Design a protein with these regions (language model features):
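P-loop NTPase catalytic core
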Residues: 361-363, 369-599
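Residue-level signature of catalytic and energy-coupling elements of molecular machines
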Residues: 194, 213, 242, 261, ...
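N-terminal intrinsically disordered, low-complexity tails of helicases
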Residues: 166-192, 239, 292-298, 307-312
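Flexible glycine-/small-residue-rich
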Residues: 217, 236-238, 246-248, 280, ...
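P-loop NTP-binding catalytic core
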Residues: 270-272, 281-356
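Extended acidic low-complexity intrinsically disordered segments
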Residues: 1-179, 223
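N-terminal "pre-motor" subdomain/linker immediately upstream of P-loop NTPase catalytic cores
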Residues: 101-106, 111, 134, 196-306
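RNA-contacting regions in translation and RNA-metabolism proteins
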Residues: 157-185, 217, 228-229, 303-306, ...
Length: 599
């Protein structure tokens, strides 16, 4: 057994070093002191592939022998990455996982010290042999709810982005003041323009080489100290940092998603879902990711002005007061008939929180497309978004072709986690725009499937409701749906969501009952009417809007009450059939209401 002296320890104690191999063939060291007790947390490890021993010197540093023969090395106490490689990728998941042994080694084979200077345990949870947790420590907490783990490895520990002063110095070092190169312009170049760019860079051009050509162009700009301007939506990560994402990638981090350090986020009070324009660069010549060092715009405004925007929860909500006359925006005769009846039965205003109760095959898809086209026509200043969750792929294609508005979709062959992340990003983007005084309309299909996705990804609370849904699973969908509101003196967020009923699933019925009283407008579709091929299959008696007097003209309201009293004694089929026949005889709803007193 080779022997060596502890030159860094106390009193020159003699330590013995032995290298052996475990059952899995991996080499491990046994470090034993001839005097003084060994550190109990490093003497034996649970769930490990080997055993190690150690002791501490007079300054409290851990003494550990390297592989092979030699003197004991003193590992640093700092909880940081080595200065020569601050961008090492720790593999999938969060960059600093304290339990994985192989993912916590530096290039030289040394283990990365955990917080407080201790080496991480191979068992993964810091427990000793008896299963007792080390005093004052516990399992590493998981990521914040709704936030993804960082895919950027150790980039967040780069010393040049750890403080505002360091960030200012980094901008002076990496940027020369020349006009920035726009990332989106390079990515959107046509084939001919890409061929010209390839010739200027002395590269061969083929369509399959577009990513390599874009990368070479950006790296040359970075080498010349030219900033790379990138515009996108801010996504926050579980470690407090962020990145830019785009709708074309369904808000998933891509190869060109710039890293946004937490220092920049805190300095300007950035929020998830904000539209940013950043100045970025490659931190090193062969670094895989862009890193943001400067901020030019937030939601199209100066960063200083954007920081004064109040948060969404601080805004004062009120009932909708500005009506959307859908009949004026109808493009087809069939859509016009449906929209005229909706205007009569359950009017919609800016800031409405509406629930469309729809059994299967009752025409909800056609109705949503009609809503999108009409709202886009009557209110061009409103942004119309269509959010499809757990939907069929062909249905997504049909919406993109037939409806006016931006479509965000997550199809049924994707994971529930993807459904939840997409929905949360869309609602955060909508909130940021409402804070700026803009109008946003979200058509959601469906809130039932969104609640199912939340039920699948939420940790089990142990409290199960009827139908198998967790008691905490509906908090996320309620937060989404409850964001719809009319802001006094500001913007509006309108959400019209479909709720599935009569599907044969008890869970779907429970979800509908939970959302039944949360909206201020309800439009019920009738399966019996659809089976008789009576469209629109709207149940007139069970549909309506709260505070409808704020949307109707007083003269119009009295005629609406007269119409309501006339259909009270009729069943659903008779009421809607009579309404359809009377509406078809007139060209506008005003003309229809004027004929009511004539019988």
């Amino acid at each position: 057994m080779p022997m060596f002296e502890d030159s860094e320890g106390d009193g020159g104690a003699v330590l013995s070093f032995d290298e052996r191999r475990g059952d899995d063939g991996e080499a491990y060291q046994s470090l034993n002191g001839t005097d003084g007790p060994a550190d109990e947390n490093h003497g034996r490890e649970e769930g490990g592939r080997g055993r190690g021993g150690g002791r501490r010197g007079p300054d409290g540093a851990i003494l550990r022998a390297p592989r092979g023969r030699g003197k004991v090395q003193v590992l640093p106490e700092e909880n940081s990455l080595p200065p020569d490689d601050p961008f090492a990728d720790d593999g999938p998941g969060e960059g600093r996982s304290g339990g994985q042994n192989r993912g916590n080694r530096f290039r030289g084979g040394q283990q990365r010290p955990a917080p407080g200077g201790r080496l991480p345990q191979r068992g993964g949870n810091g427990a000793a042999r008896g299963g007792a947790m080390e005093p004052g420590r516990g399992p590493r907490p998981g990521p914040a709810a709704g936030l993804r783990r960082s895919p950027y490895g150790g980039l967040g520990f780069w010393e040049k982005i750890q403080s505002e002063a360091a960030l200012d110095a980094a901008r002076a070092e990496f940027f020369s003041g020349a006009t920035p190169m726009d990332l989106q312009e390079i990515q959107n170049l046509s084939g001919e323009q890409m061929a010209e760019l390839a010739a200027s860079l002395e590269m061969d051009w083929e369509p399959s080489l577009r990513p390599q050509l874009v990368e070479n162009c950006l790296r040359r700009a970075a080498e010349g100290r030219t900033a790379i301007a990138a515009s996108g939506t801010l996504e926050l990560l579980s470690d407090g940092n962020g990145c830019l994402v785009w709708a074309r990638d369904r808000f998933e981090p891509s190869q060109w998603s710039p890293f946004v350090p937490r220092c920049l986020i805190r300095r300007h009070g950035l929020r998830r879902g904000q539209e940013l324009r950043l100045l970025t660069t490659f931190p090193r010549a062969n670094g895989p990711h862009l890193c943001a060092l400067g901020l030019e715009q937030v939601m199209g405004q100066n960063p200083g002005e954007a920081a004064k925007i109040p948060q969404f929860k601080e805004l004062i909500p009120y009932y909708p007061t500005e009506r959307l006359l859908l009949e004026n925006g109808a493009e087809e005769a069939g859509q016009r008939l449906s929209l005229r009846i909706v205007d009569l039965v359950s009017p919609i205003g800016l800031g409405q929180r509406g629930l469309i109760v729809a059994p299967p095959r009752t025409g909800k898809t056609v109705l949503l497309q009609a809503f999108a086209n009409a709202i886009a026509a009557v209110r061009p200043d409103a942004q119309v978004w269509i959010l499809l969750i757990d939907e069929r792929p062909e249905e997504v294609t049909d919406f993109r072709r037939m409806a006016r508005g931006e479509v965000f979709a997550s199809t049924f062959d994707e994971t529930p986690d993807r459904h939840v992340r997409l929905a949360e990003m869309v609602i955060e983007m909508a909130r940021r725009r409402v804070e700026c005084g803009q109008h946003v309309v979200i058509l959601l299909d469906s809130i039932t499937r969104l609640a199912r996705a939340y039920n699948a990804v939420m940790p089990a609370s142990g409290r199960i409701m009827s139908g198998g849904i967790d008691a905490n699973a509906l908090q996320g969908p309620k937060s989404f749906f409850g964001s719809a509101r009319n802001i006094e003196g500001g913007g509006t967020l309108t959400i019209l969501a479909t709720a599935l009923v009569e599907t044969g699933s008890r869970m779907d019925d429970v979800i509908f009952e939970e959302f039944k009283g949360t909206g201020n407008m309800e439009l019920q579709l009738d399966r019996d009417l659809a089976d008789r091929r009576i469209y629109p299959a709207i149940n007139v008696a069970r549909s309506g809007t709260r505070k409808e007097e704020l949307l109707y003209h007083p003269d119009e309201l009295s005629r609406i009450y007269l119409f309501r009293r006339a259909v009270v004694g009729l069943n659903s089929a008779e009421a809607v059939d009579m309404l359809i026949q009377r509406v078809k005889k007139t060209s506008t709803n005003v003309e229809f209401l004027m004929t009511l007193n004539r019988g």
